[in-house]
Amino acid sequence: MRIQKQQYTISSNSRINLLGILVLNVVCGKSSIFFSHPQRLGKLGGSSLGSTGPFQTLSINFCIGCFLFNSNHFDLLFSLPSSSSILSMSVLEKFCSCIDSVTRCCPSQSLETPGSVASHVVLALSSKCTPIQFNAKWSISHKSNTG
């Protein structure tokens, strides 16, 4: 697996963000490092996400991988001091791009089912990413989920 190296200026108390950036690069690099076994994916993601096809497996890797990254690290990436705002914007841009890929790859029912992995990702990012960074399908699903 090849991970592109990037240079960032960060403060000494923000070393945890290096881990976040590494995870982000792996997830958004379409790696199958997360839950690569299709049958396990079906159990973890719910019946609507279950599939043995390689394309669906990659899609579910996106959903679950980005969800785990968001829940564990995403808020930490935005706790940087103002002097590192460029880093924050860069990370936000990449993460929104990753989630946009999720909405295009995942089965539509997974986005529309309340409580699904993809629904959690969409709702968790509602305050971080602007609608223009997502496709129309994401916007419609998000509005229908929130009423």
Swiss-Prot record:
Its main location: membrane. One of its GO terms (cellular component) is membrane. The keyword Transmembrane applies. Partially overlaps YIL067C. Keywords: Membrane, Transmembrane, Transmembrane helix. The lineage of its organism: Eukaryota, Fungi, Dikarya, Ascomycota, Saccharomycotina. It is a single-pass membrane protein. This is Putative uncharacterized membrane protein YIL066W-A. It is found in: Membrane. The chain crosses the membrane at residues 13-35.
